């Protein structure tokens, strides 16, 4: 009887692992290309519909006000692919950003890698440099994401990005002096940091 229970548990675990879909830039739904009012690709329902709607509204308003085009992709797995490379390919293959301005932004969350990645087009690097991306990730997103609160983390992160890009963020500065020594130390010790992306 115990052996049967063990086998059943093993099979359930195996099926659970197999059921987790691995996404590539070929099979991930091109949501924004199909509907310009939708900015969130959330094929496995990791985010709630309410969170997706909130993010869609913020990113639509941002694009109307600034012309900056942003897409958010939230997936359980990209296999052994690298978050930075994956986000880069999404930006290029989806054509995120206005033609001639290269002002697109991809925000990618991969839950099994515990990775949150920002990838900016060249035209946006001055407005959203790596230091600011990492600050938004560590201050606004990681505290929620590390607890598995995907909705709160992604909504807070997108809100901070919009505040930065539309000029509404209060007391914001490019100066890295406002990032304390202890904040930097915590980021180095507690997180794995890669060019606009962080694992927690």
Describe these PLM feature segments:
Residues 1-24, 184-188:
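Bacterial Sec-dependent N-terminal signal peptides
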Residues 20-184, 199:
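Folded, non-transmembrane soluble domains that reside on the lumenal/extracytoplasmic side of membranes
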Residues 192-200:
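Alpha-helical transmembrane segments
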